[in-house]
């Protein structure tokens, strides 16, 4: 009963101010209290992936914590993993506000934040100061390039982030798919993608052998370009693929006054598109690397659809904004019920189930 009233209050504030207030509250949660308040995750949801152990598939997508390292408070919500970022080598303010917009009727957001963060050095110091007791699961760091860095020099930015942040990350994610940094998505083109990911994978192997490196792809790639990106990424040495980022499409929200705002759309309108991209990545990867599903997950059924489409892990952000602090617990409990309903003993048994069913049916 508390969340509806709190949501009413927060949703009457500017979206970015509401985010700062919520994030600030989570930042102040001490590790001991976080462990006491953290909801139990059903044991059948445990996942082994990327050489790491997760107590469930549901994690926090990059974008919520941009380097403040509010680790304990975020794990207290029930997440199995938390992804920090996007972090750039040098501090940057991001785009001019207003830059975050709610489309409440559609349970969606449009953002053009622009990688606002304090930079890799500050983020590294903050992560170094996080006590071990606050880390209740894997912590990933999502990295990008500064807005002022031309694409031909982008690799240096990503390598600088890897060098500074890898000691504090259980895995790293190369973000080349945000629509809010001019020209960034061009790095998904074959030659640029291959060179960038080979450089990043090689550097991480030198600095921290065995540590996973993932790449985050856009949902707006053509089927052919998506297949090519998956192949190039795997050949370059990535350990997994995050599918997807926000979309430039406004399908389903065209008439909303905020639909005209520049930026990436997230939330419920992205769900079907993101799930289709997860499925295609899963088919193309053919078991070579795991897929992390992200985009439009607003309930347990949506998370389960991502898993059945091929996601081993699932990340959320906009669903948390609309669903509140009990959102992750509801996802986990709902997933356990859905697995049991369909006769799956573990998440791993359900991964790609819809793809395999379709293949057996000749679809």
From Swiss-Prot:
Membrane topology of the entry: Peripheral membrane protein
What GO terms are given for molecular function?
A: dihydroorotate dehydrogenase (quinone) activity
Q: Which residues bind substrate?
A: 66, 111-115, 175, 180, 245-246
InterPro entries xref list: Aldolase_TIM, DHO_dehydrogenase, Dihydroorotate_DH_2, Dihydroorotate_DH_cat, Dihydroorotate_DH_CS
Q: Which GO terms describe its cellular component?
A: cytoplasm; plasma membrane
Q: How does it assemble?
A: Monomer.
> Function of this protein?
Catalyzes the conversion of dihydroorotate to orotate with quinone as electron acceptor.
Question: Could you identify this protein by its name?
Answer: Dihydroorotate dehydrogenase (quinone)
Name of encoding gene:
pyrD
């Amino acid at each position: 009963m508390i969340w509806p009233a709190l949501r009413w209050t927060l949703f009457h504030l500017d979206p970015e101010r509401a985010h700062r207030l919520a994030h600030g509250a989570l930042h102040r949660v001490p590790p001991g209290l976080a462990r006491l308040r953290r909801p139990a995750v059903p044991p059948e949801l445990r996942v082994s992936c990327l050489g790491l152990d997760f107590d469930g598939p549901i994690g926090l997508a990059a974008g919520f914590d941009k380097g403040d390292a509010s680790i304990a408070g975020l794990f207290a919500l029930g997440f199995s993993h938390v992804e920090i970022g996007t972090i750039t080598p040098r501090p940057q303010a991001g785009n001019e506000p207003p830059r975050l917009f709610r489309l409440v009727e559609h349970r969606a957001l449009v953002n053009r934040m622009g990688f606002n963060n304090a930079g890799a050095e500050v983020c590294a110091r903050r992560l170094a100061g996080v006590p071990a007791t606050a880390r209740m699961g894997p912590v990933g760091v999502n990295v990008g390039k500064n807005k002022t860095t031309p694409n031909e020099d982008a690799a240096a930015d990503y390598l600088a982030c890897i060098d500074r942040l890898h000691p504090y990350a259980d895995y790293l994610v190369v973000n080349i798919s945000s629509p809010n940094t001019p020209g960034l998505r061009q790095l998904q083109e074959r030659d640029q993608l291959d060179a960038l990911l080979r450089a990043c994978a090689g550097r991480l192997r030198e600095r921290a052998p065995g540590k996973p490196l993932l790449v985050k792809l856009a949902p707006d790639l053509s089927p052919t370009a998506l297949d090519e990106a998956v192949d190039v990424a795997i050949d370059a040495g990535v350990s997994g693929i995050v599918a997807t980022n926000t979309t430039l499409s406004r399908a389903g929200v065209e008439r909303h006054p905020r639909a005209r705002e520049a930026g990436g759309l997230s939330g419920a309108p992205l769900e079907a598109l993101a799930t289709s991209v997860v499925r295609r990545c899963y088919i193309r990867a053919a078991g070579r690397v795991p897929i992390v599903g992200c985009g439009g997950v607003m309930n347990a059924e949506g998370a389960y659809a991502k898993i059945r489409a091929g996601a081993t892990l699932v990340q959320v952000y906009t669903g948390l904004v609309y669903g509140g602090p009990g959102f992750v617990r509801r996802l986990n409990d709902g997933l356990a019920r859905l697995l049991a309903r369909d006769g799956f003993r573990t998440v791993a048994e359900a991964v790609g189930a819809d793809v395999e069913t379709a293949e057996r049916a000749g679809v």
